[in-house]
A protein has these predicted regions:
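N-terminal catalytic or cofactor-binding beta/alpha core of small enzyme domains
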Residues: 1-120, 126-138, 142-154
Length: 155
């Protein structure tokens, strides 16, 4: 299944860069995995996923969970989604639902969001907090394993 991993985030806003850090580590560790990083969100995400059968979007979230907690959402399997703070204007799930209405033929059939609960997205800095760093490593390992096995497990 033709898959792309999209990391969303801002590298100078600490934990908000988690998705981009995942992509950077994938490029270094597993260059066979197609991946890209986006900073602006919405339209940039929709454009990056065109032509793929599966998209895995990794983003920092603020849902009230413990920092570093990893959550997985199969977008097609849910009509309701938890309220998740996004610093990118429109949250990722809403972006994908909008894409389905506008570009239904070009959207990947499988859409997975991996959210990493952020601790600090307001302070400026290029390093993530320690719990988010650990979560980034777990997500990278999971995506690499998925690329070998062809599936993705629940965290």
């Amino acid at each position: 299944m033709k898959t792309i991993v999209i990391g969303v985030g801002n590298l100078v806003r600490r934990d908000d860069g988690a998705g981009v850090h995942v992509v950077n580590r994938l490029k270094a560790r597993a260059p066979w995995i197609e991946s890209t990083a986006v900073a602006l969100g919405s339209l940039e995400i929709l454009e990056a996923m065109k032509g793929y059968e599966r998209v895995i979007i990794v983003d920092a979230v603020k849902s009230g969970a413990q920092p570093g907690e990893i959550m997985k959402v199969d977008v097609k399997a849910t009509n309701n989604h938890p309220s998740i703070y996004s610093s990118h204007g429109i949250d990722v799930i809403t972006t994908l639902k909008l894409g389905e209405k506008i570009f239904s033929e070009e959207m990947p059939k499988e859409q997975i969001i991996i959210g990493i609960e952020a601790d600090d997205v307001l302070e400026y800095g290029t390093n993530c907090t320690s719990r988010v760093e650990r979560a980034i490593d777990i997500v990278v390992n999971e995506i690499v394993s998925m690329s070998v096995s062809g599936g993705i497990s629940y965290f």
